[in-house]
Amino acid sequence: MKTRHPNLLDRTTTLLVIVDMQEPFLNVIHERVRLTENVRLLAQTAAILNIPVVCTVQYAERMGGLVPEISEVLPSSALMPLDKLCFSCARSDEFAASLTATGRQQILLCGVETHICVSQTALDLVHLGFQVHVAADAVSSRTQEKHKLGMERLRDSGVLPCAAEAAVYELLGEAGIPEFKSILKLVK
């Protein structure tokens, strides 16, 4: 049987969105190392599997750009980080245009903060008809409680939570493809 469940990520229909991975946020974020490692894993997987990536930054003039740990692993096809002032990425015209240009219907979200920008973006994207997945171990907030509350709200609102590694294996689909060995090195 070749048909897969529609809630599984598919590399031909998925877009990776990396939200606000900037130093001022990460300086105070809960489990920064875990968060950064998992966002890197998703970005590297996207590069290997040719999955489009859109990154955002919140108020770059004041908060700066993406941290090097993330920018250095982005695929060359990734757009320059989109600067925004609104908390929901979906309210940015530039983000909406980038999303539409990809033609992708599944959105895999990661970044910060779970209960603010990630949640507002995810909820707006669900409202717009996208299937939204949030890698629960590739998002975080300043406290574990805020992260947990954000994830509960997302799940209750129709967003699909997953682990970053689970997302990677869904995007791979099988071990018998050429990219498998490259990605296996990332998860081992």
Predicted features along the sequence, with ranges:
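Active-site loop/turn elements of alpha/beta-hydrolase fold enzymes
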Residues: 21, 58, 137
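Active-site-adjacent betaalpha module
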Residues: 2-15, 49, 61-188
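Short acidic, Gly/Ser-rich segments with clustered Asp/Glu that frequently serve as metal-coordination loops
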Residues: 23-27
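Short hydrophobic beta-strand that contains or immediately precedes a catalytic carboxylate
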Residues: 17-19
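A short alpha/beta connector and helix-capping loop motif
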Residues: 11-12, 28-57
